[in-house]
Each structure stands twice: as C-alpha cells, then as structure tokens.
Amino acid sequence: MHEARLYERHEEYEKRGDCAGAEGSADDSCGSDSYSKSSGSVVCRLCSHGCVIKSGGYGICGLRYNKDGVLYAENYGRVAVEAVDPIEKKPLYHFMPGTRVYSLGGVGCNFRCRHCQNWEISQCTAADSLHGLSPQKAVFNAVEHRCGSIAFTYNEPALWHEFAVDIGTLAHEEGLKTIYVTNGYLTEDAVFDLKGIIDAFRVDIKAFDDGFYRKVCGGRLQPVLDSTAAAKDCGMHIEVVNLIIPTLNDSESEIRELCEWVCTNIGENTPIHFTRFHPDYELTSLPATPLGTLEKAYSIAKDAGLRYPYLGNVAGHAGSDTFCPECGTLLIKRDGYRQSGVGLVKDGSVDKCVNCGEVIPIVR
C-alpha cells in the first residue's frame, strides 16, 4: 500500500512531508498531505466528500484505507486499462491535436453516476486483482508507443492522485505532457498539488444543477466549479464536457447558465463539448439525446460568448469541426477521431486562420 498525499493533523496542526520509505522500496510509501488525523480517525482531503474514516475503514471511493491512523491508497500502481488512443477521443480538440496519447485507467470512483458508461471499472474497488505498473514503466510505455502525452482516464483519476503525481513528474522529464480526464470533484488543495504536473484538465461538468449532482451522481455542483477554476489558476489547459441527458439536464436555461459560467470564469476560448447520451447502466429507459437538442446547445454556447463549442457522439456532424470564430473558415476537419488541419497556418509557435489571421488557441 502507498501512503496518501496531503494531510494535516487536527490535534497538532502540523504538516508532515517526510518519506516513510525510500523511492523504489517495497512499500514505496511517502509522507502524506491529503488527509487530517484526529483520535485514530482521518479526514481525507483529496476530494470534496471529505470522508471521515475510522481506523480499519475506507472512504466512499472504497480505495483509501485508514490503517492505525495513517491513510493509504490501495490502488497505487494498480491498472485496469492501458491503451494508445487518438487524443481526440478524450475528447481534447485544442490540445496536441492529431497526436497519440497513452491512456491509463484504474478502478473506483467518488461518484455513483447512474448513467456511467465505464461502470464496470468505476464501480469496482478490487484493486488487488489488477496488474501492477510502476511510474517508470508507464513513461517507458508512452515513449515506446510514440505518444506525446499520458492521460489518466476511464475512471476518476483523483483516486490515483499519488500515482499521477509520480508519473507526471517523470513524464515531464521525458518531454511528455499529461492529461486529467476528471469529474472535477477534487478539493482545490488537490488541484494545486497537481500544478506543474498536469498539463490538461478535461473536466465533466455534468449539469448546472445541484439537484442533478445529488440525485444522479452522488455529489455537489459547487466543488466541481471550484476545482475547474483552480485548474485555470494553475495554468492548465481546460476543456469542458457536458453530456446532455433527456429530461435530466437538457433545459435551455440550464445549458445557458453553464455556458455563461464557463465564459466568465474560465474564458471565452474554452472548448466546450456537448455530447450525446446513449442509454447505459441504470438509465437504460431514457432515449438517446435528440440531435436538435445538441444543436441548440451549440447555438446557446455561441450566443453566450464561447468561441469553440463542439458536438460529440454524432459521427459526421460539422459540430465536431473547428471553425474560425472571426470569419467562419473551416480550420480543422474531423472524421471520427481523425483530423486534418485544413485552414490553419503556423506563425512561429502560433496557429492562425489561413483566411483572416485570427490566432487560434491550440496547445502543441
């Protein structure tokens, strides 16, 4: 087991940052900073549930374990999924477009989303049944497969916080970038602990309604907004995904509120992806999202001042393409996960519209 990061002691109000084990040792444990300790119980400070965990108990994620007043991450280095993906699959459209990403996923989640498409791993906590992977091997695999980045994805990467920090540090030494595909339910302290380690924060804002979060996901909205704003403050590239579910989060007023919040707090150049819901897990009785609903969301985003809205899970639709927000020229044509930069020109390190010269914000 690997000791969790980030904690303060309630009783002594002391910070501890020492390593309990040497790097590469059998237990590979390191001083933690993400939980508070009091009378044998600990308060996990990694995600916004703030679980109070008694000795011998687990947090809501089922993976962070209190052993004699010390919090451990049982899933450190335990991998369920490894894959080489096109980066557009995340989806990320303004971050290293056209490149390959080495994707890693584990088990567990701090949400209980009724519509989860990866529920087989997200609602599983059997980390001991998975294969082990060291940070060094993960980075080696990414380089070996000619990937430009490593993504923590498929399940909630916050539960892999310590593993992600160790991989991210090594990845940067090899010139690789790093990606968090997250539900955003981290504490702001946890986000700031990722500063300089995570390059792209691809966040799901599942609805702009706290009731939805409580009933459908088992969480709250405000912590997601706070962590997303914190990621911006840390200089991370941000792209937002909103999966639109018929009857649950598809009202025009709610979509407008979401777009206005993103535009005001994250910025008008923030890509936002409205994706089509397909019935899954516990919501198989609902229909797929009508195309018209997605197209309306696209228009609402434009009207709210967002310059780069996209549609997802709708193959062949122009809503997945990138257009110049100034002159409307087609800049990047996408066909599934394949893309071609048909209307971009390079001006030094900057991408510009071939027609009007507008600077297009893309991280290469």
Q: What are these model-derived regions, one by one?
A:
Residues 1-52, 247-364:
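Auxiliary Fe-S-binding modules of radical SAM enzymes
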Residues 46, 60-63, 108-111, 115, ...:
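Short, cysteine/histidine-rich loop/knuckle motifs that typically chelate Zn2+
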Residues 53-57, 70, 115, 122-123, ...:
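Short, non-ligating residues that shape and space the ligands of small metal-coordination modules
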Residues 66-200:
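Conserved Radical SAM active-site core
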Residues 102, 150, 178-180, 201-203, ...:
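Hydrophobic faces of well-ordered beta-strands that scaffold small-molecule active sites
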Residues 122-123, 157-159, 185-191, 201-217, ...:
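Conserved radical SAM core fold
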Residues 137-140, 162-173, 189, 193-196, ...:
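Alpha-helical scaffolding segments of alpha/beta enzyme cores, especially the outer helices
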Residues 143-170, 212-225, 242-257, 263:
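Conserved glycine-rich "GG(E/T)P / GGGxP" loop and the immediately following alpha-helix
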